Amino acid sequence: MGGIPSEQSPCALGCERQALVQVLRSYSQLVKPKIIALLLMTTAGAMWMAGNTDPFRFFITLLGGGIAAAAANVINMVYDTDIDRMMERTRHRPLPSGRIRARDALIFSGILALAAFGLLAIFTNLLAAGLAMSGILVYVGVYTHWLKRSSTQNIVIGGAAGAIPPLVGWAATTGELSWAAWVMFAIIFLWTPPHFWALAILKREDYARAGVPMLPVVAGERITAAQILLYALLMVPVSLLLVYPLGMLGSFYLSAAALLGSLLVWKAVQLLQDPCDRDRAASLFTFANLYLLLLCGAMGLDRWSLTHILWSQATASLQGIYTTLIALAS
């Protein structure tokens, strides 16, 4: 007489679900979702400024760009497994901890890259797809393979990869690259050193242990802080080029960019006053992330007509209050 098939116990099913969740969590950590979110904000900013009005194109561009960035991050993780094992900050990542095999990660990255190219090529255009692939090549080839372990300028030159997402967004919207797109590229390019060098000051011992020649390890915190201030000072006027002479954005963005840039420069000045102060380095790193998010958000808001109406009313009210106070004081 045939036996009755036994059902899996609730405990076994629970263990399987838990194992699946762990695998998904490991692959999620592999792609660095927080970094991708920041990169996609620059893509969105470029699309808003370029005048995108197609929600589907907007979604597909962010999806394809995010998948391309994920592919680059996975390949970088595979290549850097040896040094990640030496660093306290990274030794628990999926590859150095053994939760994911390098071969599986490479297959995953290949699937991601093909998916990104296909999505962008089919639903936007070949220029956007090609730019996304070039971002992977620059990040992996120039930064990870060539410069990261050999030069203090690794994140400066290699930072060009992180500046490509706004080009992808612009190309997906317009089918070409204008001066405004390249100004956005320059903003991200100049933003990268203050952002990563602030983190490198915080993790200096980790990088030194792994033999990675980050600027604070080789040149010290003071020179690094001076370089951070230099790049911050360069970035502020570049960010204003979108207002004049390009005329892409208006007074709302101008005010936001000037305020955010001034705050970033002030954070850099504070760090230069005491380059070994970890709290100041952490504050600069955190604000650098916030700066980029808010700057790109200001680009989108500036393209919204209601923003200019409200902004004009607010500035007129402030001017009226100022005039009244002057009259009362005289």
From Swiss-Prot:
* Principal subcellular localization: membrane
Pfam families documented for this protein: UbiA
Q: Which pathway, per its entry? A: Porphyrin-containing compound metabolism; heme O biosynthesis; heme O from protoheme: step 1/1
A single MF term (Gene Ontology)? protoheme IX farnesyltransferase activity
Please list the GO biological process terms of this entry.
heme O biosynthetic process
- Catalysis: reaction(s): heme b + (2E,6E)-farnesyl diphosphate + H2O = Fe(II)-heme o + diphosphate
EC numbers for this chain: 2.5.1.141
State the annotated membrane topology for this chain.
Multi-pass membrane protein
Q: Which UniProt keywords apply?
A: Cell inner membrane, Cell membrane, Heme biosynthesis, Membrane, Transferase, Transmembrane, Transmembrane helix
In terms of Gene3D superfamilies, this protein maps to:
UbiA prenyltransferase
Q: Which GO terms describe its cellular component?
A: plasma membrane
User: What are the TM regions of this chain, as residue ranges?
Assistant: 30-50, 58-78, 106-126, 127-147, 155-175, 182-202, 228-248, 249-269, 281-301
Q: Enzyme class, one word?
A: transferase
CDD domains for the chain: PT_UbiA_Cox10
Extra remark: Carbon 2 of the heme B porphyrin ring is defined according to the Fischer nomenclature.
NCBIfam families, sorted: cyoE_ctaB, PRK04375.1-2
Q: Function, please?
A: Converts heme B (protoheme IX) to heme O by substitution of the vinyl group on carbon 2 of heme B porphyrin ring with a hydroxyethyl farnesyl side group.
Similarity-based family: Belongs to the UbiA prenyltransferase family. Protoheme IX farnesyltransferase subfamily.
Protein name, entry field: Protoheme IX farnesyltransferase
Origin organism is Synechococcus sp. (strain JA-2-3B'a(2-13))
